[in-house]
Amino acid sequence: MTSDEVRDGAGSPADSSKGNKCTAAGMFQAAKRSTVSAARNIPAFDDLPVPSDTANLREGANLNSTLLALLPLVGVWRGEGEGRGPNGDYHFGQQIVVSHDGGNYLNWEARSWRLNDAGEYQETSLRETGFWRFVSDPYDPTESQAIELLLAHSAGYVELFYGRPRNASSWELVTDALACSKSGVLVGGAKRLYGIVEGGDLAYVEERVDADGGLVPNLSARLYRFAG
């Protein structure tokens, strides 16, 4: 998965018979999967006095009106991707849960696991949790279109991204602040691009600053909608 593919989003294949066939096939697969994913949601305890988190827009609280530009992200996403580490490239599996409770933020939880050459589980890998929201600044309407993504990583660092929607189905963010714990790994800032691509899948590309100070490819994945 490349940055261009994610940036262009859904409906980007070339206008050719081959492209049209690919698009039709992707739409058919997406429609087929949606009949299953539409009936799924994340588990919830029904004895709490607060609204339950939901990853299915058909259930639970209404999505906060300030988050409509992020609506396509809500759901449970599963798939595979490729990463680059100190020991070379590797494959990983991943699940991302994007939920809400009616508040002015989206809950974000991503966990991944390394895969061996046979595509089977090898070991746990990266995990992060956090929140998406839009900046609210009544004195600067343009700034109010900015996205905040606050993440805590299991590797021992906290990261704040800022960004903007590129269009109705893709979002680009860049690290603004980074803090590592005493036991955490040392990492550089990152740039992430998320997009809904052909077939309704969620794809992303992450580039991260290396020891030489330049952005280099770090992670990329394409995930299908499992729930929502």
UniProtKB/Swiss-Prot annotation:
Residues 1-21 are annotated as: Disordered. InterPro entries: Calycin (IPR012674), Nb(III)_bact/plant (IPR022939), Nitrobindin (IPR045165), THAP4-like_heme-bd (IPR014878). It comes from the Bacteria. A motif (GXWXGXG) lies at residues 75-81. Belongs to the nitrobindin family. HAMAP family: nitrobindin (MF_01297). This is Ferric nitrobindin-like protein.
